[in-house]
Amino acid sequence: MINLHSAKISEHTSIIAKEKKVRLVLKLFQKRFAKRFSKVCIEGRDIGTVILPKADIKFFFKCDLSTAAKRRFKELKKKNKKIKFQIVKKQLQIRNFRDVSRKNSPLLKSSDAVIVNTEKLRKIPDMMKKMSEIVEKKIRSKYGS
């Protein structure tokens, strides 16, 4: 099974994502996929600005480089990956730079996205609880209680 969040995949993703033809094909696929469902949750670095700019709810995850690198390093260590922390941090820094500076579909925060600062959230259930509260509030405001 392929792990889409592996270091190797992450490293190549930001390089491939710069290619205009690749972005066009993926954009078309993602938009078609989203239209097939009345409710959909899609994760990606340009989903809220390019793929689904009119989505009801958009989250923009924010985390400082050191915290993100520590989490990624810990994740890789669990998988017995022999890698140094400084390398993980540098790889994340390069990927982030590529994503925000690429010409085609750069990483941007849409004006209506909810910022989720994950620096202080130590566990996934904490983050899920916060996001669920935001979704429930949005549903109540749009459809009533």
Which stretches of residues belong to each language-model region?
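NTP-dependent small-molecule kinase module
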Residues: 1-5, 10-11, 73-79, 97-145
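Residue-level signature of catalytic and energy-coupling elements of molecular machines
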Residues: 4, 26, 41, 92, ...
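ATP-dependent NMP and nucleoside kinases share a basic, alpha-helical "lid"
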Residues: 17-79
